[in-house]
Structures are given as C-alpha cells and as structure tokens.
Amino acid sequence: MSNPNNGAEWQQVEADQLDSGLYYGRFALSPLTAKQASLLKKGLPEALLTEILCLRFTHAKIQNECVNLMNIVGIQESLDEILKNFGKIILTGKLEEFVGKGPFVAILDVRGPLNAMAVDIELPPGIKVEIETQHIATITEPIPFVVELKIELVSSTSKGETGITDEEGFSIDPNPPIQKVDTSIQCYDYQGEPFQTLFLDIWTDRTIHPHEALAQASRKIFGLLSLVFQAEYFQYNELENGLRYGKFCLYPMTKEQFQWIQTALNEALALDMSGESKHEGPVTDEEGDSIDPTFTPVQKWDITMNSYQYSGETFQGLLSRF
C-alpha cells in the first residue's frame, strides 16, 4: 500500500525467464485514483501491443515449384511449416536506423541435401539473426532452395497481407515482440481515502525484456500526449454568456493513436476539469436565461476523428471542440 502523498511509482514485483524461452515481468503502479487507473489500464496494453516494434520476415517469394500450394518437391516440410519457421526467426539490429525505411530484402540460397538454418540467410547490413541454428527446412534432394524474403518493422498487432498468390509470394505472420499483456486493479484505503494499484503482466520474446518494453511504451505514451501541444488552434470565439469556444485539430496519427488520445483527453478533462469555480456576476446561456453561477471550467467538449489518405496510407486527424 503506497502513501498517496508520495506520488505514483512503478515497482517490478516479479521477473522470470520461462521454459518456453519467453521473458515474464509483473509490475505495480500506485497510488492511483480510479480514473487514472482506468486510463492506464487501457492505454498501456495498447501502447505495448501497437508501439513496440521489431524486425521480422513478413513475406517470402520461393523460387522452387510448389505442388498445390502445399508442398515443395525435395523438401520435407510443408510450405505452411516453412513459412511458420521464417516467422519464428528473431532478427536484431538498431531499430532507430530502420524506422521509416524499408522494406528490406534478404536471400536464402542453398543446395541440398542439407538442413537450411537461419545462419544461411544473407541479410542486409545491420541486421542479424539471434539464433543462427534456428531450423527452416530439410532439403532431402540435391536441389537448390532459393527464397527472397522481405524484412519490415512490425508490432504485435501487425498482420501479414492476405490473398497473395504463388507468383507474388506468400505472407508470413511474424511472432510478435510482445506475446501477451494482462492488467488488473487492486483497491485499498489510505487514511479513509480510496486509491488503486495497477498491476501489469508482460510476456515478451527474446527481442526485448518486459521492463524495457514498459519503459518504451511509457515514453511512447508521453510523446503521444505531447502532440496535443502541437494542435492547430483554428477557431476561437467569446460567447455572449461569458464562455469561450475553441476548435483544435491534430494530425497525422494512426487509428490506435487517435483512440488513445481521445480516451486520455476524455478521462483527463472529466477528472481534472471538474472542480467547481465561482463566476462573478450573473451568468446566462445563449438564450439569455440565467444559469447556476457554480460551474466547471470546461463546460463541454467533443472529440471526433477524420480519416484521410496520403501516399496510399490511411491517417487520422483529431478534431476537438471545447
């Protein structure tokens, strides 16, 4: 139980490496109000699953002839098994060097009979495989096995393309860096006041440790909320009833980023702007009728999303009115 006067702090209460090879971490953040805990319970998992990036194979173009799009002559594994093996390969590199670039191309060019492994892949400069002996395919005949691979930065919510034909290649569903996120809230009283502790359970692959993922997600959220200060203020009016009206626009952002900012602003405005304030003199509404002089600083707000296309990509704009 934390003293609310000390401010909220993170604590790592458990850390482990599981037999499956995954890393596990359990974290606690307290003290929090109910609104704060609710906001972070929604926002942190979204940030972990959408904003933590890693390098992965996302597409494979196989030169060998496929039989009914299921098997390759002279190779023991099915096509589906081979694609899954590519998806399991963990790639490492300095991610900041690859942000906004790519996709990148890698080549697997071997001749059987042999066991093709991750070390056999020719990778672009700056990218390495973590486990060189990771199995790809068993080539049982004296034939070449040639695969052109696409490498991209992906998150835990990234999905391979669908409807790709044999001529164009095959999509790969990559193993995500964040395997799973669970949250829970525990309530407690401190000197008669209710407070809450947020618990966060994170499972990751070997790309990143849970505490590193949490730190990155927290920075992403902070940076995302900082965008609000860059909102364009394109309409302002002082109403006859003494209220002020403003319209703001913020762009570009992804749908996930919009949803989190929308939730954060709604929660923050409802929580932090709800204190009572006395207005000197009579107060009237737009029709001139008298209203209660005790009112909240922010009387009303509305946040909407506008989608638009840019260079084939879909982005969102946030429109807010206060």
UniProtKB/Swiss-Prot annotation:
Region of interest (Alpha C-terminal domain (alpha-CTD)), residue spans: 280-322
Compartments (UniProt record): Plastid, Chloroplast
Keyword annotations: Chloroplast, DNA-directed RNA polymerase, Nucleotidyltransferase, Plastid, Transcription, Transferase
GO cellular component: chloroplast; DNA-directed RNA polymerase complex; mitochondrion
EC number annotated for this UniProt entry: 2.7.7.6
GO biological process: DNA-templated transcription
InterPro entries per the UniProt record, alphabetical: RBP11-like, RNApol_insert_sf
Catalysed transformations (reactions): RNA(n) + a ribonucleoside 5'-triphosphate = RNA(n+1) + diphosphate
GO terms, molecular function: DNA-directed RNA polymerase activity; protein dimerization activity
EC class name: transferase
Source organism superkingdom: Eukaryota
Location of region: Alpha N-terminal domain (alpha-NTD): 1-232
Domain notes: The N-terminal domain is essential for RNAP assembly and basal transcription, whereas the C-terminal domain is involved in interaction with transcriptional regulators and with upstream promoter elements.
Complex formation: In plastids the minimal PEP RNA polymerase catalytic core is composed of four subunits: alpha, beta, beta', and beta''. When a (nuclear-encoded) sigma factor is associated with the core the holoenzyme is formed, which can initiate transcription.
Main function: DNA-dependent RNA polymerase catalyzes the transcription of DNA into RNA using the four ribonucleoside triphosphates as substrates.
Family: Belongs to the RNA polymerase alpha chain family.
Protein name: Putative DNA-directed RNA polymerase subunit alpha-like 2
Species whose genome carries this gene: Pelargonium hortorum (Common geranium)
Name of the gene encoding the protein in the UniProt record: rpoAL2-A
